[in-house]
């Protein structure tokens, strides 16, 4: 059975540069998807800034190649501005969680 993305369904957010998308990011994704069953991956628009050589389409393609075999339809990838601050007022229907990965994953 194939999964179909549903914008109304609770969704986890995964924000980053993904320069490049590596095994640590994949392991993090596998933990995050357990939260809601689908993940919105946000790629920060940082190409050409500091050590970020890859453009959005390249990063998106690499993520899709890695995730589609197991998770096709369960993630959406979007380009966002170079978000550096995440701010909130009152929490109204969402959680902010840090996913702490094992040390060997964090070293990747």
Regions found by a protein language model. Give the residues of each.
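Nucleotidyltransferase catalytic core that binds NTPs
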Residues: 1-108
């Amino acid at each position: 059975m194939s999964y179909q993305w549903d914008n109304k369904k609770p969704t986890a957010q995964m924000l980053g540069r993904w320069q490049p998308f590596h095994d640590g990011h994949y392991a993090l994704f596998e933990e995050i998807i357990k939260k809601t069953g689908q993940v919105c991956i946000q790629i920060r628009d940082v190409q050409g800034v500091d050590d970020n050589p890859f453009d959005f389409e390249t990063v998106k393609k690499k993520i899709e190649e890695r995730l589609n075999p197991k998770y096709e339809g369960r993630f959406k990838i979007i380009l966002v501005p170079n978000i550096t601050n995440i701010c909130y007022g009152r929490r109204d229907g969402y959680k902010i969680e840090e996913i702490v990965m094992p040390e060997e994953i964090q070293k990747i």
